[in-house]
Amino acid sequence: MYALLEIRGKQYKVKENSTILVPGWEEIKPEEVKVLMVKDEANTVVGTPFVEGAEIELEPVKQIRTKKIKVRRFKAKVNYHRKKSHRIRYTILRINGIKTSVLTEG
């Protein structure tokens, strides 16, 4: 069984016991997770736009930061130099379960 999710404007294809990388360190509320489609061996449910009665159990595993990205600016002949850097923050989520109340013939 797998599902298509939308979390913070990005879509993910997930299976049970898999992990996904979601931008940001803020806690993900259940209303932020929108289920777009659920499919098992024989049946498929496609939402219009979301599947009613579908729930995904998420567990935050770890919060990480990417490798540092460095940005440099330079203007010739005027002694202008700027250096900035940042690291993107991500949360690793584990999918513990996919639950849906209705599966229709597809």
UniProtKB/Swiss-Prot annotation:
User: Which keywords are on file for this protein?
Assistant: Ribonucleoprotein, Ribosomal protein, RNA-binding, rRNA-binding
Q: What InterPro entries has UniProt attached to this entry?
A: bL21-like, bL21-like_sf, Ribosomal_bL21
Q: Does the keyword Transferase apply?
A: no
GO MF terms held by the record: rRNA binding; structural constituent of ribosome
Q: Which GO terms describe its biological process?
A: translation
Q: What's the superkingdom here? A: Bacteria
Coiled-coil blocks: none
| One CC-aspect GO term | cytoplasm
Q: What is stated as this protein's family in its record?
A: Belongs to the bacterial ribosomal protein bL21 family.
Describe its assembly: Part of the 50S ribosomal subunit. Contacts protein L20.
Instruction: Give the protein's biological function.
Output: This protein binds to 23S rRNA in the presence of protein L20.
Name of the protein in question: Large ribosomal subunit protein bL21
Its source organism is Coprothermobacter proteolyticus (strain ATCC 35245 / DSM 5265 / OCM 4 / BT)
Instruction: State which gene encodes it.
Output: rplU
